[in-house]
Amino acid sequence: MRTSHMLEQLMEALRCLPGVGPKSAQRMAFHLLQRDRKGGLQLADALSHAMTEIGHCNECRTFTEEDVCHICNNPKRQENGLLCVVESPADIAAVEATGQFSGRYFVLMGHLSPLDGIGPSDIGLDVLDYRLRRGDIKEVILATNPTVEGEATAHYIAELCREHKVDASRIAHGVPVGGELELVDGTTLSHSLLGRHKLN
């Protein structure tokens, strides 16, 4: 079936979203045009507004429409000197949802990947270096993903911390709560055994 040029453009634009292939994009486009034109206009307006107004926090690099985000602006978040380093703004949302962290964040917007040409300055490690030099950070909690690249990035940042005499710690990785040992992969189980803690 031949479709209009504008419809093709809409479907192609929808495909920029993660996990959206040609069929999903077609379904979304048809739904908006057939059943929810008002919703489509609201979506277009919200997207346009967000793309022009949302930038990065000057302190932690997360998404915000202000120069400094609400977390970095909160004096109580500065008192304990904790800085949690994450790979993406979505990771901040995940950590915040636990209610267990009361410090500040630094968002890398990725991880080191020499094969892809992504070096330290590409993920803001020069900015992190400057923040460590300021002297208001006592401990850096490395919450990068447990991948080869995430581990390499954590190691690099730990070295930076050592240079500035700032404590560095790594979030624990291991068996999920409610998980069964026989279903856990070997690498995760190894991390669990190595990261065990005493009960008495």
From Swiss-Prot:
Zinc finger (C4-type): 57-72
PROSITE patterns with a match to the protein in the record: RECR (PS01300), TOPRIM (PS50880)
Keyword annotations of the record: DNA damage, DNA recombination, DNA repair, Metal-binding, Zinc, Zinc-finger
Record bears the keyword Translocase: no
GO biological process annotation, one example: DNA recombination
Family that this chain belongs to: Belongs to the RecR family.
Name of this protein: Recombination protein RecR
Organism of origin: Vibrio vulnificus (strain YJ016)
Gene: recR
